[in-house]
């Protein structure tokens, strides 16, 4: 039986003795349930385990007790795994050729252990420090549109076309899609493209496909208002860090923040939208979120592109079901070559979120509150390694090469235990 994560809501507006008693009772019950769930989880063996989250966001309970008001938005019920995920399928595939720039929705994509084909294969760096620039710092990056044009008959197998908003007055340029070794031998090599101040990734400074005209670096520098370079990932392997669930993880990536793939579900997105809407409509002190535009977010409506996933799934009917998947097989509708091993994706950790999803992908403007501050109200404590961070989606790796298509079926091969991956 499928039991939704989020299905009970209450809102009391009185600070009377009755409300105070009710709030204290709820806290006591939540504590008892938490203790019982810990004992039950440890007693389970194998794939069948029990996962529970706090009865409601701790900070909301704290506010309730201080003000004598019961004002919890979400009451989380027990979820027993394994559960029936129904006819869950891939509903969207998103490729982001240049890190932090606009993504492209595709119906199918080849993949390798380093991610979807051409996903985050390029990035933009500071010319002097070689720090990788993201939309966390420069929100208008999301308005740069990279477009892959594949042409097997072309010298470089096609090209990456990069265009800009019309009002920027920056001209469109192209770079080789798969430059030959002879070609890149003339490109400057950067051995220390820096990510988060610790990852040093190798890359080539790209030259334009058309020799006449300005270089990609010159055009992008105009857009950014400072000296920058477009860089293509070099051959040196960039290893991924270990996770709490996989301390011996051996995986590599290109210019992704952490891991080759990000998996998320439409049900999770809908739940985030519902909670955003509830906060936007609540005008009580306990429902206040600083900077939220109540009129704009009254109906929720945040889009999945803000979270920059690669593989979006739909069908389980359970928000955040992906939190409890350890391994999934993405199986094609029609029989094709390839083994389950190359189709098995391991979800190695939850994806902790920064302010980047606050950037509107259509305007390049960062919202003051949504979704980050809302996620911080009910999605913290999910990642055992970073309990203070809010989570949405799961990072994943794969052991081989293959093709993923919209409509492919999701099968859970192994379930996570405790609080999930």
Give the label of every model feature segment.
Residues 2-421:
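Metal-cofactor-dependent catalytic cores
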């Amino acid at each position: 039986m499928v039991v939704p994560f989020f299905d009970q809501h209450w809102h009391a507006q009185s600070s009377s003795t009755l409300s105070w008693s009710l709030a204290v009772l709820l806290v006591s019950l939540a504590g008892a349930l938490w203790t019982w769930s810990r004992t039950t989880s440890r007693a389970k063996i194998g794939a069948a385990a029990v996962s529970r989250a706090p009865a409601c966001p701790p900070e909301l309970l704290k506010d309730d007790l201080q003000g004598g008001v019961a004002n919890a938005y979400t009451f989380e019920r027990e979820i027993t795994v394994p559960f029936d995920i129904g006819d869950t399928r891939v509903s969207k595939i998103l490729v982001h050729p240049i890190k932090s720039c606009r993504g492209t929705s595709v119906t199918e994509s080849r993949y390798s252990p380093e991610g979807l084909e051409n996903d985050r294969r390029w990035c933009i760096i500071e010319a002097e420090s070689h720090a990788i620039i993201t939309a966390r710092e420069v929100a208008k990056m999301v308005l740069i549109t990279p477009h892959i044009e594949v042409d097997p008959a072309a010298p470089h197998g096609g090209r990456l076309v990069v265009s800009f908003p019309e009002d920027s007055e920056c001209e469109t340029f192209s770079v080789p899609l798969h430059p030959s070794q002879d070609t890149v031998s003339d490109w400057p090599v950067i051995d220390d493209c820096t990510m988060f101040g610790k990852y040093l990734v190798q890359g080539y400074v790209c030259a334009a496909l058309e020799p006449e005209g300005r270089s990609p670096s010159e055009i992008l520098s105009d857009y950014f208002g400072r000296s920058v370079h477009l860089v293509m990932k070099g051959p040196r392997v960039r290893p991924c860090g270990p996770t709490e669930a996989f301390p011996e993880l051996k995986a590599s990536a290109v210019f992704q923040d952490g891991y080759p793939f990000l998996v998320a579900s439409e049900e999770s997105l809908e739940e985030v939208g519902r909670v955003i809407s509830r906060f936007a409509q609540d005008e009580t002190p306990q429902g206040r979120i600083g900077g939220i535009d109540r009129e704009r977010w009254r109906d929720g409506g945040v889009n999945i592109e803000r979270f920059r996933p690669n593989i979006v799934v739909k069908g389980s009917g359970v928000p955040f079901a992906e939190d409890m998947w350890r391994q999934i097989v993405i199986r094609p509708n029609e029989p094709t070559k390839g083994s389950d091993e190359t189709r098995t994706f391991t979800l190695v950790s939850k994806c902790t979120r920064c302010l980047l999803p606050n950037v509107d992908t259509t305007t390049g403007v960062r919202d003051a509150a949504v979704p980050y501050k809302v996620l911080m109200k009910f999605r913290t404590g999910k990642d055992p390694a970073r309990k203070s961070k809010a989570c949405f989606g799961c990072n994943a790796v794969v052991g081989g090469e293959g093709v993923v298509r919209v409509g492919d079926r999701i099968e859970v091969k192994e379930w996570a235990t405790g609080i999930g991956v």
